[in-house]
Amino acid sequence: MNIQIVTVGKLKEKYLVQGIAEYLKRLGAYAKVTIVEVPDEKAPEVLSDAEMKQVKDKEGARILAKIPDDAHVIALAIDGKMKSSEEFAADLDKLATYGKSKVTFVIGGSLGLSEAVLKRSNERISFGRLTLPHQLMRLVLVEQVYRAFRIVRGEPYHK
């Protein structure tokens, strides 16, 4: 399985870089996982609704340019479906079983995802109702993908 994670902004925090690198190394035994960063749109601290939409649209265009046409796209969105780790693992396994070898996860910037990206996605998932920094979501996502492969293979880790 080829898994791509398209995310907005450059990761700067050393502890997150190290954590993600560790999980990417572990995931190498199960899948090819790549992270694609697109530049975030510079914006003032306080934005009108129209300005927020404009920022999300610009970031969204950058995201869409990185998604392969044949990818199954999973958007991480606060309004997405919440799943247990076991459900997430089963869903990833089903994608592989039904020939969806390219899976792209999308993590938006601090304002979220554009409507165009959400429309392009095949599904939306949420890791909870909490608002988390989008940089931290990268680490949470790669850990959950790793956990999913371990669960599917019946390997110890997920308890």
Curated annotation (Swiss-Prot):
The record's InterPro entries line, in alphabetical order, gives: Alpha/beta_knot_MTases, RlmH-like, tRNA_m1G_MTases_N
> What's the top EC group for this one?
transferase
Highest taxon listed in the record's lineage: Bacteria
Say if the entry is tagged with keyword Transferase. yes
Query: Where does the chain bind S-adenosyl-L-methionine?
Result: L76, G108, F127, G128, R129, L130, T131, L132
The reaction(s) annotated as catalysed by this protein in its Swiss-Prot or TrEMBL entry are: pseudouridine(1915) in 23S rRNA + S-adenosyl-L-methionine = N(3)-methylpseudouridine(1915) in 23S rRNA + S-adenosyl-L-homocysteine + H(+)
Provide the GO MF annotations for this entry.
Answer: rRNA (pseudouridine-N3-)-methyltransferase activity
Question: What is this protein's function per UniProt?
Answer: Specifically methylates the pseudouridine at position 1915 (m3Psi1915) in 23S rRNA.
What protein name is recorded for this chain? Ribosomal RNA large subunit methyltransferase H
Please tell me the species this chain comes from.
Listeria monocytogenes serotype 4a (strain HCC23)
Q: Which gene encodes it?
A: rlmH
